[in-house]
Amino acid sequence: MPVEITVKELLEAGVHFGHERKRWNPKFARYIYAERNGIHIIDLQKTMEELERTFRFIEDLAMRGGTILFVGTKKQAQDIVRMEAERAGMPYVNQRWLGGMLTNFKTISQRVHRLEELEALFASPEIEERPKKEQVRLKHELERLQKYLSGFRLLKRLPDAIFVVDPTKEAIAVREARKLFIPVIALADTDSDPDLVDYIIPGNDDAIRSIQLILSRAVDLIIQARGGVVEPSPSYALVQEAEATETPEGESEVEA
């Protein structure tokens, strides 16, 4: 497993910054190092230990040709989730999680089929034969399906695992995966319940730098495990954009 993350990189990405104490989940206590100014600090040695365990699982799954569904619908995770999942050739959900995406997979797959039907229709001359009012209605339907299912459409069967950014926000996705005994990987902050996650990466799940570092290295590992060539991730540009919009206090406007 040559892909590695150092403690220095974790520190620079702010992975150690948790939430305010008033927002913590007591079950997360074993991953907390200290409290400073009312903010919990995550123990990066514990993060490193869990990263090694989690990355070994991801590597093994990738080598066996397994599929990981990436899930991250919060604003600061959306673009990173999309870019990294696409880089890995994996399905993703970065808009709203539609209830039943896993537990009612057959019905959701029918919506994907509808999406493909509409795309084919709009790519053919037949669409011009439809009344204008119907064209507008179908276009609206197409855009909605594309928004919510563009990343999910790659999933032809239930995934072998899901990788969520913030299991508290993505509670429905986590609950559906657990119901179907699908392993849950998660970048989880101090407000999370570790007992709901099979492979936890204790860390800041709000900062763009933290999300990008963890997801890009996980995807590097997937690519490498499948015999591909790892190249610099284009999602790092999002980190640079965040740095360019930082306020004088050092807090990114995007991360706020």
Curated annotation (Swiss-Prot):
One of its GO terms (cellular component) is cytosolic small ribosomal subunit. Keywords: Coiled coil, Ribonucleoprotein, Ribosomal protein, RNA-binding, rRNA-binding. InterPro entries: Ribosomal_uS2, Ribosomal_uS2_bac/mit/plastid, Ribosomal_uS2_CS, Ribosomal_uS2_flav_dom_sf. Residues 104-149 form a coiled coil. GO terms for molecular function: rRNA binding; structural constituent of ribosome. Signal peptide: none annotated. Part of the 30S ribosomal subunit. Contacts protein S8 and may contact the N-terminus of Era. Spans the head-body hinge region of the 30S subunit. Is loosely associated with the 30S subunit. This is Small ribosomal subunit protein uS2. The gene is rpsB.
